[in-house]
């Protein structure tokens, strides 16, 4: 079966983290699928699609029609990809989903080799591993997060210079108080002491050393 022959068909997917998504299959690229769920266009990296199916008509419990008020941000004449989509979303209010707890709202500032820099009005400057991005939703109707005005959303929210790789960027934060993975594990916050053999040494609030596997770091933000 050629999956691209089914563009425009209702589909159900399971994403990493036991998340279920259903909607209309809009496009498929080299490393990205686009689904319209009746409200938003979701851009889902292929690597996080655990399984999918085209349900039978009697299994579909919703009717989804494409909206004239919204359109995807990709060029229909080009093959879509995650990097192209992130680039197109720069400066657009965007929702991203990384951890199992909640979505993050804000703006993509910069796209590096294996991570991107994201500004959230709540968490401020964040570093997001591309390997752990489950999906993103760029909003194309001039929405602003939390009803904030442009004056409350700094164009250059950080004076930090960004390293090309996620690993080197974390190394630059040695001696800094940080929170990993949005605090989903209360132990994953403290002061970075160093990085060695793909493990981050963290000093916890009680002064104890804790070693975190770099490959399992999804997000980083400073306190």
Residue spans for each PLM region:
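Short glycine-rich, low-complexity segments
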Residues: 1-105, 109-189, 193-223
């Amino acid at each position: 079966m050629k999956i691209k022959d089914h563009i425009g068909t209702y589909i159900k997917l399971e994403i990493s983290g036991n998340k279920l998504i259903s909607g209309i299959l809009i496009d498929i690229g080299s490393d990205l699928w686009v689904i319209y769920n009746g409200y938003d266009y979701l851009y889902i990296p292929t690597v996080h699609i655990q399984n999918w199916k085209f349900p039978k008509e009697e299994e579909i419990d919703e009717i989804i029609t494409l909206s004239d008020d919204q359109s995807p941000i990709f060029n229909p004449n080009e093959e879509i990809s995650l990097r192209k989509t992130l680039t197109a979303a720069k400066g657009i209010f965007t929702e991203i989903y990384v951890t199992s707890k909640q979505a993050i709202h804000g703006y993509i500032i910069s796209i590096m080799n294996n991570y991107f820099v994201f500004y959230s009005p709540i968490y401020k400057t964040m570093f997001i591993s591309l390997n752990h991005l489950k999906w993103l939703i760029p909003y194309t109707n001039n929405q602003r997060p939390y009803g904030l005005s442009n004056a409350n959303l700094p164009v250059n929210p950080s004076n930090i210079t960004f390293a090309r790789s996620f690993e080197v960027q974390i190394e630059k934060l040695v001696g800094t108080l940080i929170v990993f993975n949005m605090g989903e594990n209360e132990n994953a916050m403290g002061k970075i002491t160093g990085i060695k053999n793909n493990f981050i040494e963290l000093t916890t609030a009680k002064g104890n050393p804790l070693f975190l596997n770099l490959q399992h770091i999804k997000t980083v933000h400073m306190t």
